[in-house]
Amino acid sequence: MSKVNVNKVVVAYSGGLDTSVIIPWLKENYDCEVVAFVADVGQGAEELEGIEAKAKASGASECYIADLKEEMVADYIYPTLKTGAYYEGKYLLGTSMARPIIAKAQVEVARKVGADALCHGCTGKGNDQVRFEGAFAALAPDLHVIAPWREWDLVSREQCLDYLAERNIPCSASLTKIYSRDANAWHISTEGGVLENTWNAPNEDCWVWTVDPEQAPNEAEYVTLKVEKGEVVAVDGEAMTPYNALVYLNEKGAKHGVGRIDIVENRLVGMKSRGCYETPGGTIMMEALRAVEQLVLDKSSFEFREELGLKASHLVYDGRWFTPLCKSILAASEELAQDVNGEVVVKLYKGQATVTQKRSDNSLYSEEFATFGEDEVYDQSHAGGFIRLYSLSSRIRALNSQKK
């Protein structure tokens, strides 16, 4: 396939080996100006240290760094959290939720600098290529998209290092990289290495943030979360922004080994992959939010929220954030969350986040109605008529069967 003519391209730059190679490769193969874009989504200060100089040393004419941490948690993570989304019952979508905001910010930089193309460093085997390019299609259909991993003939880290060395481009990456990792404020994922064999238990070096639950403190710790409209607004009596609340709970949860999962998931592109994910703060938030929902939502609303969560998990995972259906589901979840206000105490102990106390001014739970003793507000004789009507279709079906 012939290459398109490109004058200026904005590349999503991480500072790692792949994107360090991509910058000179773009200049050589497309004869274009390359602008580096770096998204700060909470991956850690050490990942960002010296990154602008690194990008320019690789050949970028400019480097834009966008602090997206607060926006990501407030506008992407919290809305998804309100749907109750777990992908395939376990995964809290850490990587998936970060991609749409990175893509959106990358498009904004492209518009600012007058670029006519966008570039990402995702491989041709993973989900992220779909997430980025799906977002680009929704936000900037007029811009060309370049995916070097689907074009070049570099197939190993050794070849990538040689490529940079031949061009005298400095790179601190090592030849042997055991694991592939992705981190943001919500989670860190680890893939590859020993995890590629599902019969291998994860090594301790598969975990980065969290303490081994067996080595966690022998004394439990309790955190109190205040929830308003489905969002954590305060922790342990202190009002916090969404990002600061997450950072605080990450620290508390990691100390007690909370939020570890080892999962084999179905990728969008058809294959299965295995990963170890750590989401300490997110796990605590999800448990607290669900506890308030149990108090506040009626049966039909709770069931509907469960359905929304299942669909939302697939839409977010599959890179369909900027679609009408995803927007509609998020809007419905937002409406359901209007009365999800309350306070929850969560016990952190040996890898578990357990709700021990919960209350809400909007609670539909009534001790008077729920009591098993004698009461004045619930006449048990009324239940018989309800059950007869509730089971009417089953009764008619059985009677019809008896006639045959």
UniProtKB/Swiss-Prot annotation:
ATP binds at residues 12-20, 39, 121. One of its GO terms (molecular function) is ATP binding. One of its GO terms (cellular component) is cytoplasm. GO terms for biological process: argininosuccinate metabolic process; L-arginine biosynthetic process; urea cycle. It is found in: Cytoplasm. It catalyses: L-citrulline + L-aspartate + ATP = 2-(N(omega)-L-arginino)succinate + AMP + diphosphate + H(+). Its main location: cytoplasm. It comes from the Bacteria. Keywords: Amino-acid biosynthesis, Arginine biosynthesis, ATP-binding, Cytoplasm, Ligase, Nucleotide-binding. InterPro entries: Arginosuc_syn_C (IPR048268), Arginosuc_syn_N (IPR048267), Arginosuc_synth (IPR001518), Arginosuc_synth_CS (IPR018223), Arginosuc_synth_type_1_subfam (IPR023434), AS_cat/multimer_dom_body (IPR024074), Rossmann-like_a/b/a_fold (IPR014729). L-aspartate binds at residues 123, 127-128. Its EC number is 6.3.4.5. Pathway: Amino-acid biosynthesis; L-arginine biosynthesis; L-arginine from L-ornithine and carbamoyl phosphate: step 2/3. Coiled coil: none annotated. Belongs to the argininosuccinate synthase family. Type 1 subfamily. Homotetramer. This is Argininosuccinate synthase. The lineage of its organism: Bacteria, Pseudomonadati, Pseudomonadota, Gammaproteobacteria, Vibrionales. The gene is argG.
